[in-house]
Amino acid sequence: MRYCVDIDGTICTPTVGRGYEKAQPWSDRISTINKLYDEGNHITYFTARGMGRFSDDPDASVKASALLFDLTEQQLKDWGCKYNDLILGKPHADIFIDDKGIQCDDFFNDNGS
């Protein structure tokens, strides 16, 4: 199975403004995702980091990735996250409507975190 997992507010504390370096990991949630990885599932971390500041730019995802990919990759490593892919460029939005979506608190409550 393939899982696409957000970062801020999902596996770490939400950040205010541009303070991504201040995010603190939620170890129980990371352990849940790592277990899925260990069971052979494909894990992609997909984040909107940096997208708000470039929202009107057609190259927003490229610019966000150039600005924050290294920091985000290092955080995932430092936090012990196991994954297959890291993608920056998730559109900045207040609400996502998706036929395969699940609210993160519901997912982690159902999976023992």
Where are these regions (language model features)?
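Catalytic phosphate/metal-binding cores of nucleic-acid and nucleotide-processing enzymes, i.e., regions
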Residues: M1-S113
